[in-house]
Regions:
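N-terminal periplasmic/intermembrane-space "pro-region" immediately following the signal or transit peptide
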Residues: 20-75
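Outer-membrane beta-barrel proteins
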Residues: 95-97, 101, 125-144, 188-197, ...
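Transmembrane beta-barrel wall of Gram-negative outer-membrane proteins
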Residues: 102-124, 133-165, 201, 205
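Flexible loop and strand-edge segments within Gram-negative outer membrane beta-barrel domains
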Residues: 132, 154-206, 228-238, 256, ...
Length: 569
């Protein structure tokens, strides 16, 4: 009976943004193992430091295997995973290339003493010229501090994220002009853009009633501040373009901001292989949008579990709101098991949430809508992953499925829940790696099915490279080769810049299937690495008339160069 009661508590109440994370116990094992590098494995440095550049605005990338329908809307900051190191570690990585593309990252990890740990991350990503006058600048700063003593522990997380996008409607014509560079072709609305900013401050405090380091029980207090805002600006003959305006005929400067404060209080229990938290919390939020202003107070229960049992690692959390946004809930669970050279992981989640404030009520220069009724939208997600690092042919296999009901979609200049009632996506991916002497072969195959056919069904890629040392001493290591890929066709989506979201289009136009060809060469000299990458070589041999989205052509030939350096004291 007690086991079922505990399961009910875990599944019924939680409002934590992360799973149970007590500052006491085994969380301080080193995560920066010998051989750790900020740029990852040597054979994929070019991928880690130079994400594929495409012309689509926002974060939607149909060429990546993982996908969620929430990627079509404004995408918010994803915090970095916690790291622990017994010795100070500082690292940076930087890459640059065509279209003024630049990516930089600096990390700092240190155990100040046996009870105090600090982590800092700064990430910057910019580009200019995927289309004329189109660029973005993204900055992310995150600071984490963790401290413990015999009776007290604390976790402090502070982060800021800013995203500044210059936007346009892409090419004015329906086809790309042959014989002209992409960045010299005309565009519409080159003087429009949006800005999103976030600030988060999360402070958890644990007061233990026991001095036994292996068994901790006591009170947990948490306060969290979240601020998000989005702005859109555009200067043009707006009445002629949109047919109406709300406050200015030539200049739009729309904005909304959502600020919220959470206060949680509860109990926790921690031993060597078990960590549990549960309690009650309240949230006050304030929504400000031009002439609109709304605020309310919510109350909820929360719980989180983290345990290890017979080699299985289980992390679970859940929530239920009973005052304010009554009926909102979320259940999430992660299960992992390592067996010799194999690692099995599974993730499942279910949530019921009301649409975002800006989706329900919004006033802008060229938009104006307000919902009378709202419905809870549901999202069900599951994925499994199996990886094997055997000595013969290392491989991995993964699959995922996502189902959404009553998800808000942007149709005819407003968000609606009564049109596309069900949206789902499912995919499976397998890959392997084979090494023979100094020959390295890597390959992966992905297949996906999505509502509306907005994703390519097939994604195929293969890399063949020389993997070995150079010169007599063999201290300079290199992985140099080519990457060949294939992308099947998919339905092109439209983009609404004034609300920063993608729109299902009835144009009937589609991305035409195509082959991909890239060259890469990366080098390792101890803690210092560098790489060069030439991607989209195939575009020099085909007519530039293919599109990734309505008005957004396929990216042409790109050159990339980057370095990384790790410092261990």
């Amino acid at each position: 009976m007690r086991k079922w009661a505990l399961l009910f508590v875990v599944v019924a109440f939680c409002r934590l943004n992360s799973l149970a994370q007590s500052p006491f116990g085994h969380y301080f094992q080193d995560t920066l193992k010998p051989g750790y590098r900020i740029s990852g494995k040597l054979d994929s440095v070019d991928v880690n430091l130079a994400a594929y550049q495409h012309t689509l605005p926002g974060f939607f990338n149909p060429f990546l295997f993982s996908f969620s329908y929430s990627d079509l809307n404004t995408t918010w900051h994803k915090p970095q995973q916690r790291r622990y190191s017994a010795i100070p570690h500082i690292a940076f990585e930087y890459s640059m290339g065509s279209k003024l593309a630049q990516f930089g990252k600096i990390t700092y990890t240190q155990a100040i003493d046996s009870n105090t740990f600090i982590q800092f991350d700064y990430i910057r990503n910019t580009t200019n010229g995927n289309l004329r006058n189109s660029n973005f600048e993204r900055n992310s700063v995150q600071l984490s501090l963790m401290h413990r003593s015999r009776y007290y522990g604390t976790i402090l997380d502070v982060s800021f994220y800013g995203n500044n996008n210059q936007l346009n409607d892409g090419l004015t014509g329906d086809s790309v002009r042959e014989g002209f560079p992409l960045n010299f072709q005309e565009v519409v609305k080159s003087n429009a853009g949006n800005k999103t900013k976030e600030f988060h401050a999360d402070w958890k405090n644990y007061i233990s009633f026991t001095k036994d380091s292996l068994h901790k029980a006591g009170v947990m207090l948490q306060s969290r501040l979240d601020i998000k805002n989005q702005r859109y600006f555009e200067r043009d003959t707006l009445k002629q373009i949109y047919g109406f305006y709300n406050y200015d005929s030539t200049y739009s400067y729309d904005y909304w901001e959502l600020a919220s404060l959470r206060l949680n209080g509860g109990m926790f229990y921690k031993n060597q292989d078990f960590n549990f938290e549960a309690g009650l919390g309240t949230r006050y939020w304030d929504y400000d949008n031009m002439v609109l202003h709304q605020d309310t107070t919510e109350a909820y229960g929360y719980a989180a579990l983290d345990m290890i049992l017979k080699g299985f690692s289980l992390k679970a959390a859940a929530n239920y709101t009973f005052v304010g946004a009554n009926g909102e809930m979320s259940v999430v669970a992660d299960l992992g098991k390592r067996f010799r050279s194999n690692l099995f992981t599974a993730h499942a989640s279910f949530s019921r949430q009301y649409p975002e404030n800006y989706q329900r009520n919004y006033y802008a220069n060229t938009l104006n809508y307000s919902w009378i009724n709202r419905q809870l939208s549901t999202k069900t997600l599951g994925n499994v992953h199996w990886s094997s690092k055997n000595r013969v042919i290392p491989f991995f296999a993964e699959a995922f499925i996502e189902s959404n009901t009553n998800m808000p979609v942007f149709i005819q200049n407003r968000w609606r829940q009564d049109t596309l009632m069900h949206l789902s996506v499912a995919g499976i991916q397998v890959g392997f790696e084979y090494s023979y002497r100094k020959l390295l072969i890597q390959s992966r195959v992905s297949y996906r099915e999505s509502s509306g056919n907005l994703l390519p069904n097939w994604l195929l890629s293969g890399r063949i490279a020389y993997n070995g040392g150079l010169f007599k001493a063999q201290k300079l290591k290199t992985v140099t080769g080519i990457e060949i890929g294939y992308i099947s066709s998919y339905r092109l989506m439209d983009f609404a810049p004034m609300i920063n979201t993608y729109v299902f289009s009835n144009s009937g136009r589609a991305f035409r299937e195509m082959m991909k060809l890239h060259f890469y060469s990366q080098f390792d000299l101890g803690y210092f690495r560098w790489f060069i990458r030439i991607e989209n070589i195939e575009q020099t041999f085909v007519k530039p008339t293919n599109f990734e989205g309505l008005g957004y052509p396929v990216t042409p030939l790109q050159f990339r160069f980057g370095v990384s350096w790790d410092f261990f004291n």
